[in-house]
Design a protein with these regions (language model features):
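Noncatalytic, solvent-exposed loop/strand surfaces
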Residues: 1-192
């Protein structure tokens, strides 16, 4: 993600996952921060697939190993979460790759899985300043075989004064209330 003269990257460096802040003018690192160990390949991807997000003062980054961390623009860590420790292992066939969505001081993190787990898929709202979970909304699916898994990123939909968090995957598209997580609508049958 780029903000003014800074570029933020989620980087796999050997066994480690790191957040790099680069100078946009010359590509030189301004700082690097350790996120987690345990980088590995899941088929064709490593654990640095999710993109960082920023509001211009802070940067948040999720790893495929389940760590979600917040830093200020000087590289000082503000908070850290381990989503897998809190809610159970990710059960995706190809590894976790969804980026968080930042909207009005909240991060929306989706875990749509089912290939390697019987645990339900879910959407989280996390307070961006403190890192606490505000709510967790399960997202059921009737998807078969590999279809429960999704590597997409939540999207923001705004129309007629209404704001929704839209999730695609698990053979469905769903719209959710950003305040409560409640599913407002569902379009099924994406994988006949």
């Amino acid at each position: 993600v780029v903000w003014n003269e800074k570029i933020f990257l989620n980087v796999a460096d050997g066994d480690n996952l790191e957040l790099w802040c680069l100078d946009r003018n010359n590509g030189q690192p301004l700082w690097k921060r350790f996120l987690s160990s345990g980088n590995h390949r899941e088929r064709k991807q490593n654990m640095s697939s999710p993109s960082p997000v920023t509001d211009g003062r802070h940067v948040w980054v999720m790893t495929g190993t389940g760590f979600l961390r917040a830093f200020d623009f000087d590289g000082t860590e503000v908070w850290m979460r381990d989503i897998q420790a809190d809610y159970g292992p990710f059960g995706l066939n190809w590894g976790y790759a969804s980026s968080p969505l930042l909207y009005e001081n909240a991060l929306y993190v989706q875990v749509l899985h089912g290939m390697r787990t019987d645990d339900p898929s879910y959407l989280l709202r996390i307070d961006a300043a403190m890192g606490a979970t505000v709510w967790r909304q399960e997202r059921p699916t009737e998807a078969l075989r590999e279809s429960p898994d999704s590597y997409t990123t939540p999207a923001l939909l705004q129309y007629d004064g209404v704001t929704e968090i839209v999730i695609t995957g698990g053979d469905a598209v769903t719209g959710h209330d950003p305040e409560t997580g409640q599913e407002l609508w569902r379009a099924d049958g994406l994988n006949p």
